[in-house]
């Protein structure tokens, strides 16, 4: 698991994405996309874009995943745990992207040793799962 180095810009974006920020709509989506891009630029640029898929965990992960996708120019797919059966992408590198990981149950069911996890917020109780 990787973490962005916190600075004023990162802290401001994270604050915008929290449920108590009062921010919604395009401004919230853009904050998630910027955080995704910044995480990708700091942690995933060494990955081969032709052999990498970012998976947006629906619905909360869509804009965060798009930020990663645009930064990496890799493959993209969406996964809705409520309606979809999980099929791991055939690429070597898979990044599971969700804006918030609460219990970790959704990702625990699809996570493997080759998978990377990207999230804006991970509940400390879920961290030991990964």
PLM segments and residue spans:
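PRPP-associated nucleotide enzymes
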Residues: 1-130
